[in-house]
């Protein structure tokens, strides 16, 4: 079930050279699970932009997006006080009801943001979360400190070796041994095959 609504932009700020955090105020009751997404209508654009929800509470939701084209570039120019037309409550999200005690979360780049609200939910349940986060280089790292603030163990992998483990997020996974069978992933197909 989804809901259309108008949301107020409370903040829109860069986290890295190409990754931005937007905080929106409005009715979030249709977002019921970590891992869901919203569709954003942009002025002058025919197609809505799907963006995963990084975090949410009763009155706000946080989106983290990468500027890769004209639509997301348009989003990066939006200022606090503006409004956006959103469809919320899209996607199934993650099932957290049967999570193991030591779940492993694996994400690369913009696949990381929806894992944050998942980590938040799991740590609130008393789970000992390990998050393996993959980036191209150290200058592109975001959300690592936020995961740590939740109490999650964080393993960083960078393709160029400038921070953490030198390699892909799958190389970061190889460095983790203390987790149980539940794993959650939002990266590329090759990573999903490795998680399996």
Regions found by a protein language model. Name each.
Residues 70-196:
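FNR/FR-type flavoprotein reductase catalytic core
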């Amino acid at each position: 079930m989804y809901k259309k609504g108008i949301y107020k932009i409370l903040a829109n700020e860069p986290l890295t050279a190409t990754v931005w955090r937007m905080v929106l105020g409005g009715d979030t009751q249709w977002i019921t699970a970590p891992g869901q997404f919203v569709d954003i209508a942009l002025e002058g654009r025919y197609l809505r932009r799907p963006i995963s929800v990084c975090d949410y509470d009763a009155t706000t939701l946080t989106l983290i997006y990468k500027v890769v084209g004209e639509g997301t570039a348009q989003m990066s120019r939006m200022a606090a006080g503006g409004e956006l037309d959103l469809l919320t409550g899209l996607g199934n999200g993650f099932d957290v009801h049967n999570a193991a005690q030591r779940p492993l979360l694996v994400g690369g780049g913009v696949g990381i943001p929806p894992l944050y609200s998942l980590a938040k939910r799991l740590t609130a349940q008393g789970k000992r979360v390990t998050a393996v986060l993959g980036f191209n280089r150290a200058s592109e790292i975001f959300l690592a400190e936020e995961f740590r603030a939740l109490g999650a163990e964080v393993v960083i992998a960078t393709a160029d070796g400038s921070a953490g483990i030198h390699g892909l997020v799958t190389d970061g996974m190889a460095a983790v041994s203390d987790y149980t069978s539940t794993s959650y992933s939002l990266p590329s197909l090759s990573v999903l095959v490795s998680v399996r």
